[in-house]
Amino acid sequence: MQRPRILHIFSRYGEVGGEEICFHAITEALGAIADVTPFVYSTEELFHSPHGALTKMGYLLHNRDVEQKLRKCLRENRYDAWIIHNTFPAMSPCVYELALHQPAPVTHYMHNYRSGCLNGVFYRDGAPCFSCQGGNYFPGIMHACWRKN
């Protein structure tokens, strides 16, 4: 019987944290029963790229580098399932756009709420905050919710 092929996607932050530890533990555990292809892109790759600040900001919405690398990966392999841990900030929602056109099911691990809140906790200035929920991150940018930037 052929082992299932799993595409395991993770966007690394600048520092190792719980999400990354979880990603590696799941990769190792799944490796016992499936062929796992880790697809990792680092925030550092984005922030230390030669692109200008406006281009980098645009990559938060659609990262062409990630899209090209992921398309290459999909041309070379066929996957039975996708597991996505996070795409913010380095990968962008283009990962989900590509996943929609694949026959494989997608599982998304929600380690935090960053997809709807830049600081990931729906809390700002001592009170609940849902200003960015729905995908408009402008309030979070104005209030410097992510890394106080």
Task: Describe the function of each predicted region.
Residues S42-C73, I84-N86, W146-N149:
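A short, charged, and often flexible helix/loop element on the N-terminal side
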Residues F23, V66, M91-S92:
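Amphipathic coiled-coil/heptad-repeat helices and related helical stalk/stem segments
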Residues V16, S92-P93, G116-C117:
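Glycine/Thr-rich phosphate-binding loops of Rossmann-like dinucleotide-binding domains
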Residues H8, K72-M91, P105-H111:
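Short N-terminal targeting/anchoring amphipathic segment
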Residues Y13, T43-L46, P89, Y113-S115:
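Residue-level marker for beta-strand->alpha-helix junctions and adjacent short loops that shape enzyme
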Residues M1-E44, R75-N77, V95-P105:
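N-terminal subdomain of nucleotide-sugar transferases
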Residues S49-A53, M110-N149:
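Acceptor-binding helix/loop patch of EC 2.4 sugar-transfer enzymes
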